[in-house]
Amino acid sequence: MSRYDDLFARLDTAGEGAFVPFIMLSDPSPEEAFQIISTAIEAGADALELGVPFSDPVADGPTVAESHLRALDGGATVDSALEQIKRVRAAYPEVPIGMLIYGNVPFTRGLDRFYQEFAEAGADSILLPDVPVREGAPFSAAAAAAGIDPIYIAPANASEKTLEGVSAASKGYIYAISRDGVTGTERESSTDGLSAVVDNIKKFDGAPILLGFGISSPQHVADAIAAGASGAITGSAITKIIASHCEGEHPNPSTIRDMDGLKKDLTEFISAMKAATKKV
């Protein structure tokens, strides 16, 4: 069984959903990002979605786009991301590690090399947000060869054909979005019709469903679980907390001015989000 299989089986037995934070690697530096990741896990995060910084993050709203920029200002590279994943994997051998990476990275490195490198570093899954499932066959094949779970996005208003394709191609979990647009709490998740979104995906008997985009409060998490999702992913709300503790102006590197304060704020937020995954 994969780490995702183990996680979802354990949570199902416990009557809980998964809470998965998105955290940008190297934001604002590798060492500080590792402390942030460790804090998230210790606060109750069930799995991780880690971002690799990119200069043109088209699927991300302003908050997460700024985290890409902070990481790049600090000198982040794909190679440094791989080293950070190795460190996280060594520290947390059982925690599923998902990656969010833009599609030019595998093209630049070569598909087979790309997936093999991330598998060897300790990643469990990779989501390429700018690669739709209809273009995913070569990525899925390279992922399978490396032992990586490919993840695809199930858009809120997708056709049945698209949802069937996403369900067939996604391994580990399915990333379902609660509304159209880019990531971020600039537009919060709408819980209207959420059960229908989840039910439409479940018809195709795919991997567990994690709901993302605009998930910023415990109520959003509770609504996702009540709608039948297996968990929720939160990115922009966490990134905002990190940004509120950063100092520095682009293009100069940033730093965390109060790591203890950041850890406290993250722990309070993540603990509340995780508590909301309890099924009633």
Curated annotation (Swiss-Prot):
Pfam families: Trp_syntA. Pathway: Amino-acid biosynthesis; L-tryptophan biosynthesis; L-tryptophan from chorismate: step 5/5. Its EC number is 4.2.1.20. The keyword Lipid biosynthesis does not apply. It comes from the Bacteria. It catalyses: (1S,2R)-1-C-(indol-3-yl)glycerol 3-phosphate + L-serine = D-glyceraldehyde 3-phosphate + L-tryptophan + H2O. Gene3D superfamilies: Aldolase class I (3.20.20.70). One of its GO terms (cellular component) is cytosol. Belongs to the TrpA family. Tetramer of two alpha and two beta chains. This is Tryptophan synthase alpha chain. It comes from Corynebacterium glutamicum (strain ATCC 13032 / DSM 20300 / JCM 1318 / BCRC 11384 / CCUG 27702 / LMG 3730 / NBRC 12168 / NCIMB 10025 / NRRL B-2784 / 534). The gene is trpA.
